[in-house]
């Protein structure tokens, strides 16, 4: 898949802010970031309150996704451009959601909010008022999502890519350092997993590294491109970014995102775990 099919530049974005059929949407870890200023015409997608089920741990179901996108004024034929802060990590999470429900024309703004701001481009607090649509989603695409049983079976057989920080992988932390350390019952990583922090795929300005650089990053870490791959992190957002890199940029079609990730796996009873911190004690 060429980059033009899944990425747009900030130049392209600025030239297409008012193009019919193009919808910009901001998705941030900090769901209030949009309110302080966003790309003109962009809508807000709240990953926590709008893309997640409020009762069970799962994403919104098909009907919920249809209702959300209809209310946001997104049509089935629209080109959706997703962007956000911190190298697009939650924008990539939303991209994965859109692909799960079959929206074919969705792309990331290369560099996200960081690149847009570094360029000195306009931000506004004005919120758009888009007419509602009647969006229709497809059934979830099971080929891009991994569940716990498949993950356990993958140990020693498939590529397991832990995209968390080295300290999380080593069992020193349960979550990123700036977050509460209470997401899983146990620390460590899935046996046979390689550690390739998701942020290694990004340049300083938030844009993605070149294909050659990305291949080197994963090749040096020991990724076997002949095997199926499952990426995981803590809740599935950082691993969505790695899933995007491996599948959409590098063209590995046999890649799944395990959105249960360490929050689920680290709390399962009886599954194997490697924890260098405990083993070295």
From Swiss-Prot:
Record: residues binding substrate: 238
Pfam families in the cross-refs: Rhodanese (PF00581)
UniProt domain Rhodanese: residue ranges: 18-125, 154-274
Top class in the EC scheme: transferase
GO MF annotations, alphabetized: thiosulfate-cyanide sulfurtransferase activity
Catalytic residues as annotated in Swiss-Prot or TrEMBL: 233
Record InterPro entries: Rhodanese-like_dom, Rhodanese-like_dom_sf, Thiosulfate_sulfurtransferase, Thiosulphate_STrfase_CS
Catalytic reaction equation(s): thiosulfate + hydrogen cyanide = thiocyanate + sulfite + 2 H(+)
EC identifiers of the protein: 2.8.1.1
Keyword Transferase among UniProt keywords: yes
Domain notes: The structure consists of 2 domains of very similar conformation, suggesting a common evolutionary origin. However, the sequences of the 2 domains are very different.
Record protein name field: Putative thiosulfate sulfurtransferase
């Amino acid at each position: 898949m060429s980059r033009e099919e899944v990425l747009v530049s900030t130049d392209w974005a600025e030239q297409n802010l008012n193009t019919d059929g193009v919808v910009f949407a901001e998705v941030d870890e900090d769901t209030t970031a949009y309110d302080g200023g966003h790309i003109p015409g962009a809508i807000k997608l709240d990953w926590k309150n709008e893309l997640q089920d409020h009762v069970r741990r799962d994403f919104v179901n098909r009907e919920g996704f249809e209702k959300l996108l209809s209310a946001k004024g997104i049509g089935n034929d629209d080109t959706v451009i997703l962007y956000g802060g911190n190298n697009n990590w939650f924008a990539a999470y939303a991209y994965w959601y859109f692909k799960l429900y079959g929206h074919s024309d969705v792309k990331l703004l290369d560099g996200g909010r960081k690149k847009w701001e570094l360029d000195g481009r306009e931000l506004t607090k004005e919120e758009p008022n888009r007419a509602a649509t009647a969006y229709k989603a497809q059934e979830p695409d099971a080929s891009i999502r991994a569940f716990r049983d498949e993950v356990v079976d993958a140990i020693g057989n498939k590529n397991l890519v832990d995209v968390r920080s080295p300290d999380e992988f080593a069992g020193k932390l349960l979550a990123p350092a700036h977050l509460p350390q209470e997401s899983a019952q146990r620390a460590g990583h899935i046996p046979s997993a390689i550690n390739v922090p998701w942020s290694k795929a990004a340049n300083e300005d938030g844009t993605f590294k070149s294909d050659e650089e990305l291949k080197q990053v994963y090749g040096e870490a020991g990724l076997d491109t002949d095997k199926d791959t499952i990426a995981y992190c803590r809740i599935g957002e950082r691993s969505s970014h790695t899933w995007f890199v491996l599948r959409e940029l590098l063209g590995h079609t046999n890649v799944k995102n395990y959105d249960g990730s360490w929050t689920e796996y680290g709390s399962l009873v009886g599954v194997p775990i490697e924890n260098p911190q405990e083993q070295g004690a």
